[in-house]
């Protein structure tokens, strides 16, 4: 079980304790600091929808330090980011790998950032551990190809890179530092101080 820090605030009624994630949420900040699975995706989606309902015109900040994870869970977060009216400002702190990098580049254009020592990794989708009958494996292989086409097209759209370059670069792990990610179009700026 992970340790979640508590924040104590003084109010005119006394003290109030929050877990750190709830306190960040009050400032329109969502922190994605784990592998992405269905449970984490549901939490991030719920936070995006909540913040959008609270104020559809206020930027939502999504801080990412994730090794990636489930394609379907990540695409659910992606679709929600595109669905809500708010601009979603993305930040890479540490690493944004695989689906983490996909979400980083999917932030609002002009509002995608990385800290100087960030590591960004893109690659093609995979669904490891396939076994079973040949027909089932064939079904899953076709699904992987379908999802690869979707994610490659979306990466091309968000980075400005040609589809051919994306297809070539994601064939194997493609690792970038922050300046390389900026040049590639995954982020817009490298920052070392909070934006005001």
Swiss-Prot record:
Name of the encoding gene: clpP
Entry's Gene Ontology BP terms: protein quality control for misfolded or incompletely synthesized proteins
Catalytic residues in the record: 98, 123
EC number of the protein: 3.4.21.92
Cellular-component GO terms for this entry: cytoplasm; endopeptidase Clp complex
PROSITE patterns per UniProt: CLP_PROTEASE_HIS, CLP_PROTEASE_SER
Superkingdom of the organism of origin: Bacteria
Functional description taken from the UniProt entry: Cleaves peptides in various proteins in a process that requires ATP hydrolysis. Has a chymotrypsin-like activity. Plays a major role in the degradation of misfolded proteins.
Compartments, as annotated in UniProt: Cytoplasm
Name of the protein in question: ATP-dependent Clp protease proteolytic subunit
Record keywords, A-Z: Cytoplasm, Hydrolase, Protease, Serine protease
Assembly information from the UniProt record: Fourteen ClpP subunits assemble into 2 heptameric rings which stack back to back to give a disk-like structure with a central cavity, resembling the structure of eukaryotic proteasomes.
Family designation: Belongs to the peptidase S14 family.
Reactions it catalyzes: Hydrolysis of proteins to small peptides in the presence of ATP and magnesium. alpha-casein is the usual test substrate. In the absence of ATP, only oligopeptides shorter than five residues are hydrolyzed (such as succinyl-Leu-Tyr-|-NHMec, and Leu-Tyr-Leu-|-Tyr-Trp, in which cleavage of the -Tyr-|-Leu- and -Tyr-|-Trp bonds also occurs)
Pfam annotation, one family: CLP_protease
MF terms in GO: ATP-dependent peptidase activity; ATPase binding; serine-type endopeptidase activity
């Amino acid at each position: 079980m992970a340790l979640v820090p508590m924040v104590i605030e003084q109010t005119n009624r006394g003290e109030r304790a929050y877990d750190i994630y709830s306190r960040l949420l009050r400032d329109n900040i969502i922190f994605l600091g784990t592998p992405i699975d269905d449970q984490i995706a549901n939490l991030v989606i719920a936070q995006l929808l909540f913040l959008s309902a609270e104020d559809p015109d206020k930027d939502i900040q999504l801080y990412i330090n994730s090794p990636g994870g489930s394609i379907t869970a990540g695409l659910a977060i992606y679709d929600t980011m595109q669905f809500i009216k708010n601009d979603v400002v993305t930040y890479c702190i540490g690493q944004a790998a695989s689906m983490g990098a996909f979400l980083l580049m999917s932030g609002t254009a002009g509002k995608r950032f990385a800290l100087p020592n960030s590591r960004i990794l893109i690659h093609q989708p995979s669904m490891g551990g396939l076994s079973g009958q040949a027909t089932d494996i064939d079904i899953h292989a076709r699904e992987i190809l379908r999802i690869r086409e979707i994610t490659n097209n979306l990466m091309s759209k968000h980075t400005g890179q040609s589809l051919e370059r994306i297809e070539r670069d994601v064939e194997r792990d493609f690792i970038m530092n922050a300046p390389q990610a900026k040049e590639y179009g995954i982020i817009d700026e490298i920052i070392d101080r909070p934006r005001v």
